[in-house]
């Protein structure tokens, strides 16, 4: 009977210590798939030299130990579960990494001792990976803010650039206008080309007017004498033709001597060549006619007829019949 009472007393003492210093911790923890979670379990100071463990199972008597300390503060890791005992703060920490959906269930914080171990039940739940994590949302907000700032900066730079362009030349490239440095050479080249064309047209008009007005007043018409051989007592045919070569020359003597002086200088400065068809008269035989056009205001030029072509000073042609003709330029 005394032994029974002693055993009952010892059991009561053991129960008092157990109720007084149990292992405590969170009743429920959760984590995200592919993430990690940490569980802190506290114990009494007199249990610091005992081994601590983390086990899984619905019943405390049949749970499976996943990781256990060696009664020291050294970190112990098994697979993706680790445990470390902090004997100064009387806590041991359990960390589960690379969580899977299959890791959800009932776990226990335990201390190994004689008899029944001290244990505390912890329910672990695993949540699927969120579609938009919190960190991603924060990053998105930051990116939007940065974009707004950059846009404002670009707008300011664009306005400043446009103002500079307006101040420098008044022509901006934003609206499709040409730069002033390109526009000025183009305008100058166009004006130069227009001036060249106008000058060419004016020169051609002046040249035509001079050509239509005839030779200058200081020039005279030279005469070339052509002889048609006389045919005595023979009626001239209709097809007997004589040609006269007329050329313009500078005068060298007075108007009265033009007939001889101009005939002797037939080789100087010929400008125009004209052919004149002359037919003999049926009434009387005229060998040739000499035509001399003088400038306005000058005396008429007289020319003699001869039977030979003469280009030098006139000579005595004998007793042949001589006829003179006076021709003046009509008044305009």
From Swiss-Prot:
Extracellular side, ranges: 19-181
Protein name: CMRF35-like molecule 1
Domain of life according to the entry: Eukaryota
Residue ranges of the region described as Disordered: 251-270, 313-332
SUPFAM superfamilies per record: Immunoglobulin (SSF48726)
A GO cellular component entry from the record: plasma membrane
Compartments where located: Cell membrane
Domain Ig-like V-type as annotated: residue spans: 22-125
Site (Phosphatase-binding): 243
SMART domains: IG
Main localisation: membrane
Gene3D superfamilies per UniProt: Immunoglobulins
Keywords for this protein: Cell membrane, Disulfide bond, Glycoprotein, Immunity, Immunoglobulin domain, Lipid-binding, Membrane, Phosphoprotein, Receptor, Signal, Transmembrane, Transmembrane helix
Disulfide topology: 41-109, 55-63
Signal peptide interval: 1-18
Cytoplasmic topological domain residue ranges: 203-332
Subunit field text: Interacts with PTPN6/SHP-1 in a tyrosine phosphorylation dependent manner. Interacts with IL4R.
Annotated family: Belongs to the CD300 family.
